[in-house]
Amino acid sequence: MRKEECFYLGKIAKKFSFKGEVLIYLDTDEPELYENLESVFVEHNKHLVPFFIETSSLHKGDFLRVRFEDVNTEEDADAIVGNSIYLPLTMLPKLTGNKFYFHEVIGFEIEDKRLGVFGKITSINDSSAQPLFEVLNGEVEILVPMIDHFLVKIDRENKKVIMDLPVGLVEMYL
C-alpha cells in the first residue's frame, strides 16, 4: 500500500511489556473507533508494512495497547518503537456538511462569495496555530485562513470550497 492511499493514525510510543506489547499513541479525537483493528501499516524504512494485531485495548485515553503477530520479545518491540502507524483512507469515517479532512480538499477550487473562484487548493499548512489553505492563482500563492466563520460550504460534488472572506484578504496577494 502506498502512503498516498493512507492516513496517519499515530505512532508506536513505547514498549509495554517484556512479551513484545507496545503502546500506540492515537492522534485522533475518537480513539475508540480504532480499538478493534485487525491490522495496521507500520512505516519502516520509508515503506508501509502490514502488521497483524493479535490483541488490542484502549489504554489511558489516547493510547492503544497492542500485541502484534510475530512481535514476541522486547527486542522485537524495540525495532518498531517510534515508527508511524497508517490505515487505508477507506477506513476514515465519512464526514458530511462543512466538516472535512485536510487531504480531501486538496485540488478543490476555492471560491469567495464576492470574488468568485480565485484558485485551487494545493495544500494545507497546519504548522501554525491557525491552519491555512495554500491556494495557487496562476503563479501566485494565496494563504487563506481556515476559519469556520468564513466557511460557507464544502461542495464535494463540484469539488469546491466556498467562503465569505473579508474584503482585501485575497486582493492583497493579487
Swiss-Prot record:
Pfam family, one: RimM
GO CC term, one of those recorded: cytoplasm
This protein's UniProt keywords: Chaperone, Cytoplasm, Ribosome biogenesis, rRNA processing
Domain PRC barrel: 97-173
GO biological process, one term: ribosomal small subunit biogenesis
Keyword match Amino-acid biosynthesis: no
Molecular-function GO term, any one: ribosome binding
Location of the protein in the cell: Cytoplasm
Quaternary state and interactors: Binds ribosomal protein uS19.
Comment, domains: The PRC barrel domain binds ribosomal protein uS19.
Protein purpose: An accessory protein needed during the final step in the assembly of 30S ribosomal subunit, possibly for assembly of the head region. Essential for efficient processing of 16S rRNA. May be needed both before and after RbfA during the maturation of 16S rRNA. It has affinity for free ribosomal 30S subunits but not for 70S ribosomes.
Family to which the UniProt record says this protein belongs: Belongs to the RimM family.
UniProt protein name: Ribosome maturation factor RimM
Organism of origin: Flavobacterium johnsoniae (strain ATCC 17061 / DSM 2064 / JCM 8514 / BCRC 14874 / CCUG 350202 / NBRC 14942 / NCIMB 11054 / UW101)
Gene: rimM
